[in-house]
Amino acid sequence: LGSQDWSNGNVAMIGKSYDGSTPWQAAMFGNEHLKTIVPISGLIGVKELMWKNGSSEARAPIMHNGVYGSYGFDGDEEDYGNLCPDYIIGPGTGVSAWMWGSEVAGDYWAERYFLDRVLDNYGGSVYLIQGMQDWNVDPHMAVPTINMLKDRGIEAKGLFGQWDHDYPDRPIQLSDRSELGGRG
């Protein structure tokens, strides 16, 4: 986009939740046109979402590879075009990480960890938005991440507050969910 005739050369990316991993993934390549990213409860890595402090969440073995991966299949002959080697090994990798703490073989999780390459390659800014009551994408995706960015000289700002897995400017949804325990 940044090199198109109609562009001023500056590109930004935004995404929320799992889609919030896309800005991180774009930033890890150090593209000169990517000036800012805005991950809203965005994933710095897929494994880091559900494995931390030596334990995993119950959804860990199947969530991304089983649940999200199944969205590409609807029972028609075009489904074969959606198959790729990573989709096939993904569920096994999730189970092996759940059982043994890491993958048995390959670099499936390393490919899906973006933060280290962002710290090494990205020259733009980051505006982190994170609900501190978010129990879907936990706040550890934003803190200490913001400090790591700043320590590496990446301009980083944050909007953190007491909301769950949602946008901070949706008060009606926030109050509706608070009756459910605010666990997002």
Annotated model-derived regions:
Residues 122, 128-130, 134:
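Short beta-strand/loop motif that positions the catalytic acidic residue
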Residues 150-184:
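Alpha/beta-hydrolase-fold serine-hydrolase catalytic core, especially in secreted/extracellular enzymes
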Residues 25-121:
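Accessory cap/linker subdomain of secreted extracellular hydrolases
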Residues 13-15, 40, 129:
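Short beta-strand immediately N-terminal to the catalytic nucleophile in serine-hydrolase-like folds
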Residues 135-143:
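Conserved alpha/beta-hydrolase "acid-adjacent" motif
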Residues 8, 33-35, 155:
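Core-facing hydrophobic residues within beta-strands of well-ordered domains
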Residues 1-17:
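Gly/Ser-rich "nucleophile elbow"/oxyanion-hole loop immediately N-terminal to the catalytic nucleophile
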Residues 15-25, 136:
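Glycine-rich nucleophile elbow surrounding the catalytic serine of serine-hydrolase chemistry
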